[in-house]
Amino acid sequence: MFVYGTLRRGQPNWGRLLAAAAERVVAGRLAGVLLLDCGHYPAAVERPGAGEAVGEVVWIRSDAWLATLAGIDHLEGYDPADRDRLYDRVLRSVDTADGPVDCWVYVAGPMLAGSARPAVTGGDWVAYCADQPGAQ
């Protein structure tokens, strides 16, 4: 799974949903997306040539996969039957230092993709948040 926002290590949802299930974590980059600032979380909008999202590829233990996926689906508001869902879960190729890896990634669903939001400068949510006024 590729994570680029609040599910990254050190971010609010890492400990809640991924830390105990993670088997391995490496840095990764997802090309062809524009990362948007949705307030307390980002959304990756698929736009070929638009830029990239900086994040992490997380390998999840097989015995924890289904429960972890269900928890993240819930967090991301992903329900394929809901036309107003916040995110879509799609399989995409993510670049890592060891080469490309096919990963599940949550990209902006119909509701978020059509909204007017500011872009996350540089495509790195963690760095972007650290640069905001009042960041510690």
PLM features: residue spans?
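Glycine-aromatic micro-motifs
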Residues: M1-Q136
